Amino acid sequence: MKTFSSFFLSVTTLFFFSFFSLSFQASPSQSLYREIHQLISFKDVLPDKNLLPDWSSNKNPCTFDGVTCRDDKVTSIDLSSKPLNVGFSAVSSSLLSLTGLESLFLSNSHINGSVSGFKCSASLTSLDLSRNSLSGPVTTLTSLGSCSGLKFLNVSSNTLDFPGKVSGGLKLNSLEVLDLSANSISGANVVGWVLSDGCGELKHLAISGNKISGDVDVSRCVNLEFLDVSSNNFSTGIPFLGDCSALQHLDISGNKLSGDFSRAISTCTELKLLNISSNQFVGPIPPLPLKSLQYLSLAENKFTGEIPDFLSGACDTLTGLDLSGNHFYGAVPPFFGSCSLLESLALSSNNFSGELPMDTLLKMRGLKVLDLSFNEFSGELPESLTNLSASLLTLDLSSNNFSGPILPNLCQNPKNTLQELYLQNNGFTGKIPPTLSNCSELVSLHLSFNYLSGTIPSSLGSLSKLRDLKLWLNMLEGEIPQELMYVKTLETLILDFNDLTGEIPSGLSNCTNLNWISLSNNRLTGEIPKWIGRLENLAILKLSNNSFSGNIPAELGDCRSLIWLDLNTNLFNGTIPAAMFKQSGKIAANFIAGKRYVYIKNDGMKKECHGAGNLLEFQGIRSEQLNRLSTRNPCNITSRVYGGHTSPTFDNNGSMMFLDMSYNMLSGYIPKEIGSMPYLFILNLGHNDISGSIPDEVGDLRGLNILDLSSNKLDGRIPQAMSALTMLTEIDLSNNNLSGPIPEMGQFETFPPAKFLNNPGLCGYPLPRCDPSNADGYAHHQRSHGRRPASLAGSVAMGLLFSFVCIFGLILVGREMRKRRRKKEAELEMYAEGHGNSGDRTANNTNWKLTGVKEALSINLAAFEKPLRKLTFADLLQATNGFHNDSLIGSGGFGDVYKAILKDGSAVAIKKLIHVSGQGDREFMAEMETIGKIKHRNLVPLLGYCKVGDERLLVYEFMKYGSLEDVLHDPKKAGVKLNWSTRRKIAIGSARGLAFLHHNCSPHIIHRDMKSSNVLLDENLEARVSDFGMARLMSAMDTHLSVSTLAGTPGYVPPEYYQSFRCSTKGDVYSYGVVLLELLTGKRPTDSPDFGDNNLVGWVKQHAKLRISDVFDPELMKEDPALEIELLQHLKVAVACLDDRAWRRPTMVQVMAMFKEIQAGSGIDSQSTIRSIEDGGFSTIEMVDMSIKEVPEGKL
């Protein structure tokens, strides 16, 4: 028995050790057990427990998704593009603590928090945290100091910032690659902080896409191979590169650099990429290190002259060359023919001329992309172009002066690889060649803005890869070919302004990727097909100015991306379907991002001009060519033309933005569902047969900018809820059957009477006052708004009677005091009732809201100057003779201004604000106290203010010579003539005042309404900027642009305001530029017969191509012809201020610096000025970004 037990024990022991041995071999090593625990603990903190399904504690971690092992150790983890949704602390505690980890890649993994307070092992060499939501100071990266072996660090595309004053440095001397691009880093000492401890082994440094300024000194980084400092605020000079013999990639684009850069890069002999685009370099191209260069971009600067022959030294290695956006002229140099490796050549937006240099181009055997757009090439397309197009991927000849037919054999080569063909904005005639279908790889075909005739070839239906078909503004006729149904990749179909007939082809229902359909201004008929509702990507549908008929299909409400619907001027009937709006709050419009457009806002000056405006695709077309539309469109092409690139940012929460159904035969009611569109900014239902009342829900359209319900059969009252439409700049309710009082709150008091006419029962400002006996409902309206002048008069009469009874018991002094009081009360009563001698200014007579005569008379002025502190409202009444019309010296968007002579004989100006109902006393007084403290010799000081009931009066220092507008444009009336010396003083003074508001006030003040009528002149003709802070006050201190400002000052408003409705200091700079142009030209910003269809800005640009000095005021040239050079110098300043790209405009401090340079004698030649004017930035429609922003909660 004992023997058996021993045997059993031995067998059991042997079995146990054998099993243990086998189990150990099949399972992770002991070192991996700890790592399993760390990895699983990381998974456990993920919100989505199903995200890493194969990460399990009973598995070998080396088999986990994204995990790599070596020698039974986890050495690499790659979870890029997985939505981890965790804080960085979870990463540092679980993953970075893995002892054997060498690489951790977490790009685009939804990681947030600060990079601080952690340690990592010395084995970590690569860490990629790019494209996340990391925040906090970039200085927290010093926590990585424990990662002594770290060579690769990428934290780009986060929101890291720079704290300003810091000590020490990054202390990562082992780094070879450092990428801080696309964060929120700003300041002048960033590069110094990064490199404060030397460069170590650094080979790759990228800090692009921030707001860094100061110096870039990398002279100690002798190993540096890659340097990208693009898209920052560097302006002080060229980077200090030192010995850059190892540098291969240098990108300094998108800054404000100028000067001689060739010396700084002279030792960079191994450069393969050099990008200095979008800076401020001028003159001829300087010598460059060309030996190894593969890509060279000098685009978007101000280089001049012909292309120098020394660039041929790069032909042995050069594959890409971009010289676009400069001022080069002459012919394309023949030496390009020897650049056999060149694949991309961009010479757009220069002044090259002549015929296409085919001999040179055909020698460039490797050419794939050829962009010669926006030049002055002319003639017919040569037959030899067929041989070139066979090897090209992109051919862009848009916006030149080509003529004749489009070559029928352009695509005859069976090996043709052409993908993009841009021939728009030329003078091509004849028919569209059906043989274009032989270019079977075509993705984009753009033939708009020519003189092409005939039909659209049905053969285009065989282009199975075509995404964009743009043929607008030609003379095409016939029907839209049914064969387009086979182009299932089609996204953009733009055929406006032709002579097309027939119906929308049913085959287009197969093109489910369509996002922009624009068929306006043709002769199309039939109904809107219901299948359009199945186009889930459709964002823009334009069918205006055709002969479509039938009902508007409710299926349009199935379009999940529709933001722009223009159906005006057709024959539609029936009702507006409520189902159209069921996608509101769910729309995502990302499908049209990056599309170039112009929007022409109709001015309503011609009866034939229908609709709110016209949205046009505008890629590759010169802005001045818009005049060609006048032959096909009855509307004026005025200064109200806005453009840019669409960049929608809806996150599935958007709504329609533009809805125009005007000039049809629609009937029925306005559906209440129309109020569900928070992003709608234009609504036009005018000129239909719509009846019923305006639904209260219209008041929910808080982003609404333009509302037209005119010429319908609407009845009832204007909903009081519409007072909440604070963004409203235009309204037209005329020609209806509306009745009752016009709402007194919101924007209604800013609109002229014409917008409410021909509504028999409508009353109240700006129409005649309502008769209380007309309706019981109005009596209730009266009571809810306090006592009216009639009841006020009764109170005054009772007070006078009581005084008469008591007078016998009073002494003489008391009697005299009562006499004075009765006189003042009578004056107030007479004025408030509108029975005084106020001329025809009815608006003032009906507009006062006072709470008790005695209280009003005794209210003191809240003064910022001691001599005024005892003034009362009664004193102001007396000083203006009851605000008599004779005392009126000006009117503006914020109210009327009166001259008041005080008892001591001094004069002040009193501004009576338009009603700002809804703003509390606290906000008003706080704003006044802020404005009253602002003192500067070039600002009109606020002396005091007075609140009487709902009325607000502001008291200013009186300016003897009134406004610049009056003095400049009506010198006889003003009694003074402005010579150049005075105008220059006014220009500098107003700039100095505006600069003080922008840069010396905390927080800075945006004027929002800078114009010549807001530049006042004192007794010394010194400029004083007025009305600063008024737009902010009138919009209840919101950061949105004052609506009344937009409506009241055409010609001064920068283009970007009409897209984002947000103001900025750079918007003030634009407006100042217009004022400076007024001083130089002597012309008003709009409505001059010299301008034609332009405004002042466009007119000056036109003259830049002729004789620029012709724009100057002839009176100045008579004064001294030698002034021309100085006037040109000041014109250059105006040009800089008027750049359509807001980010390129100078600040007002920089404007002052420009004036200082001019005074110091640093001249600017006339050719330089002309070139600046011809630069794209001066156009009235160039490069204005349109952002369809998600509005924060509570702002709508």
Swiss-Prot record:
Consequence of mutating S1168A?
Answer: Decreases peptide phosphorylation, but no effect on autophosphorylation
* Function recorded in the entry: Receptor with a dual specificity kinase activity acting on both serine/threonine- and tyrosine-containing substrates. Regulates, in response to brassinosteroid binding, a signaling cascade involved in plant development, including expression of light- and stress-regulated genes, promotion of cell elongation, normal leaf and chloroplast senescence, and flowering. Binds brassinolide (BL), and less effectively castasterone (CS), but not 2,3,22,23-O-tetramethylbrassinolide or ecdysone. May be involved in a feedback regulation of brassinosteroid biosynthesis.
* Effect of disrupting the coding gene: Dwarf phenotype and aberrant leaf shape.
The entry's stated outcome for S1044A is: Abolishes peptide phosphorylation, and autophosphorylation
Q: Origin organism of this chain?
A: Arabidopsis thaliana (Mouse-ear cress)
Q: Could you confirm whether the keyword Glycoprotein appears in this record?
A: yes
Effect ascribed to mutating S838D: Increased kinase activity
**Would you tell me the protein name for this molecule?**
Protein BRASSINOSTEROID INSENSITIVE 1
A Gene Ontology biological process noted in the UniProt record is: anther wall tapetum cell differentiation
The entry's stated outcome for T842D is: Increased kinase activity
Q: What is the effect of changing S1166D?
A: Increased kinase activity
Q: What is the effect of changing R983Q?
A: In bri1-108; brassinosteroid-insensitive dwarf mutant
Residues annotated to bind ATP: 889-897, 911, 957-959, 963-966, 1009-1014, 1027
According to the UniProt entry, the note on domains is: Contains one leucine-zipper motif and two pairs of conservatively spaced Cys (Cys pair 1 and 2) involved in forming heterodimers.
One annotated GO molecular function is: transmembrane receptor protein tyrosine kinase activity
